[in-house]
Design a protein with these regions (language model features):
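Conserved active-site motif detector
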Residues: 2-11, 17-127
Length: 127
């Protein structure tokens, strides 16, 4: 998916006068590690659609592909290890991956509380 996004972005970068914005969703995941951060304190202020910040942590001692997820500067957790490899590689290559909350569920299981999507903004041709 990231390769396709890069090809599309490059083709429109050559013709900026014909460009508009589009979003390609790269993946949708549950938030890992929510129970270890201040999510409980922030919960009442979080909303579906809120922007999240992705922070690459290549020196993380537990996972060299770690990507931390933050809400308004506050750490919430991580992209799950099983889903982070491609995102980490693309971030390391300079791809500006973005994220937002797509589901909030008041569940006992912390893996079910926050679901988010990672996307890339692209330029697309105008008709």
């Amino acid at each position: 998916v990231f390769r396709l996004a890069a090809i599309i972005a490059l083709s429109f970068a050559l013709h900026p006068a014909c460009a508009a914005e589009a979003r390609i969703i790269v993946q949708q995941s549950p938030l890992a590690g929510f129970q270890y951060y201040d999510g409980k304190v922030l919960w009442d202020n979080m909303r579906v659609g809120d922007a999240l910040t992705l922070v690459r942590e290549p020196q993380n001692p537990h996972d060299s592909n770690a990507v931390r997820v933050e809400w308004k500067g506050q750490p919430l957790g991580y992209v799950p290890r099983r889903d982070n490899r491609d995102v980490a590689r693309q971030m390391d290559r300079g791809v500006a991956a973005q994220a937002r909350i797509v589901n909030l569920k008041d569940a006992r299981n912390p893996w079910q509380r926050v679901e988010f999507e990672i996307f890339v903004e692209l330029a697309v041709a105008r008709p």
